[in-house]
């Protein structure tokens, strides 16, 4: 299988392209969070359902050659590598420094009278550090929903409320799987608050809104993409374990024009240490907040994972010996705040189922739509991915 870094970049970009078909404004989500949830589902699926989910973790080239050997045993052996990567990644993340908070938490809420296979529960604990909490969906669906929502709220510093809205959980719900990513980090070099000024952010050539524009001049990892007429800048957090990358086109309306010229592989290449160089940069970055929620079943089905959500096709025989289990809901909510001190970001996935320019400095003036993502540098995994286009 591909590395978690490559997979999270690919899923992040593919999912972004799907979401932007129906979202004109800001977009923000956690590729690693969504992948973790898919991994936990994959652990309990078999047959064609498992094969579809497994394709997410392989490049197209790999997938074509592996389709020939879709024997059940081999699929299970193959997927073990996927789960081991998550185990390693989640263990690494849990050991990170005290300079910021980064928590990835998984939990299963299961109907207390429904029998889940012990083997599944053991594996999901082993690989994903997730335990099963029995709840009474049959007699107390709404209380159970509120209980799950308050758990998510407590784990995201109260940034994500009501992950599961009214009516999303019923007495027939058997299992709710929740993944939660919370990050609060400080920049390696904070922006001085006294340099933050009100400025216009251009959503397009004729429409602007006021933003609080933060400014600093320093050395940053930088690359100019000549053929795209765009710049990429890496802004490190304390200790350099994590960085935010910003991809800013030169033109106000340049982002839409270049999206189709960007691929996940190119994003990895452009932001690799060998490709970027340290340059003196005048950076102007808006202070911003984005909060977003998505119902992902249709989006993931469009990306080839439809069987997991189909009552008639889903095969969850690795999770339960009972029949009829399938994922009814795949909800994902996320929040990010970017300030002078740093970034606060959270995401939860639920399956219910003015500085004057000095000579020689590069100017990166983020006063029009840009892409941004937050990456764990050691594993190259994309924790969060977004587009900021509307203050």
Swiss-Prot record:
Keyword line: Cytoplasm, Protease inhibitor, Serine protease inhibitor
Record-annotated site: Reactive bond: 356-357
Domain of life according to the entry: Eukaryota
PROSITE patterns the UniProt entry points to: SERPIN
Molecular function (Gene Ontology), one example: protease binding
Major location category of this protein: cytoplasm
Compartments, as annotated in UniProt: Cytoplasm
Pfam families listed in its UniProt record: Serpin
Xref: InterPro entries: Serpin_CS (IPR023795), Serpin_dom (IPR023796), Serpin_fam (IPR000215), Serpin_sf (IPR036186), Serpin_sf_1 (IPR042178), Serpin_sf_2 (IPR042185)
Function summary: May play a role in the proliferation or differentiation of keratinocytes.
Record family assignment: Belongs to the serpin family. Ov-serpin subfamily.
Listed name of the protein: Serpin B13
Annotated source species: Homo sapiens (Human)
């Amino acid at each position: 299988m591909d590395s978690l870094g490559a997979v999270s970049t690919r899923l992040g970009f593919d999912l972004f392209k799907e979401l932007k078909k129906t979202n004109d404004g800001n977009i923000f989500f956690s590729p690693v969070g969504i992948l973790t949830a898919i991994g936990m589902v994959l652990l309990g699926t078999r047959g064609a359902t498992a094969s579809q989910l497994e394709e997410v973790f392989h490049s197209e080239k790999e997938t074509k050659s592996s389709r020939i050997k879709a024997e059940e045993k081999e699929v299970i052996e193959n997927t073990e590598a996927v789960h081991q990567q998550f185990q390693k990644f989640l263990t690494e993340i849990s050991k990170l420094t005290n300079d910021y908070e980064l928590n990835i938490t998984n939990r299963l809420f299961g109907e207390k009278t429904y029998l889940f296979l012990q083997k599944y529960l053991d594996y999901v604990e082993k690989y994903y550090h997730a335990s099963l909490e029995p709840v009474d969906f049959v007699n107390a669906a709404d209380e159970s929903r509120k209980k799950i929502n308050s758990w998510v709220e407590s784990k995201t510093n109260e940034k994500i409320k009501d992950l599961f809205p009214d009516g999303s959980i019923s007495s027939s719900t058997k299992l709710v799987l929740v993944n939660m990513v919370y990050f609060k980090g400080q920049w390696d070099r904070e922006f001085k608050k006294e340099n933050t000024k009100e400025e216009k952010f251009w959503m397009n050539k004729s429409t602007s809104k006021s933003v609080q524009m933060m400014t600093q001049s320093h050395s940053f990892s930088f690359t100019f993409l000549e053929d795209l007429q765009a710049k990429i800048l890496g802004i490190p957090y304390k200790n350099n374990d994590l960085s935010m990358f910003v991809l800013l086109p030169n033109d106000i309306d340049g982002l839409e024009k270049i999206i189709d010229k960007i691929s996940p592989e190119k994003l990895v290449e452009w932001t690799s240490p060998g490709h970027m160089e340290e340059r003196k940069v005048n950076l102007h970055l808006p202070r911003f907040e984005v909060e977003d929620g998505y119902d992902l079943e249709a989006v993931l089905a469009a990306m080839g994972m439809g069987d997991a959500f189909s009552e008639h096709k889903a095969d969850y025989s690795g999770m339960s010996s009972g029949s009829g289990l399938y994922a009814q809901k795949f909800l994902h909510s996320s929040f990010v705040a970017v300030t002078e001190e740093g970034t606060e970001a959270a995401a939860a996935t639920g399956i219910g189922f003015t500085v004057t320019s000095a000579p020689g400095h590069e100017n990166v003036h983020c006063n029009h739509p840009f892409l941004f993502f937050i990456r764990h540098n050691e594993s190259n995994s994309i924790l969060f991915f977004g587009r900021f286009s509307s203050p």
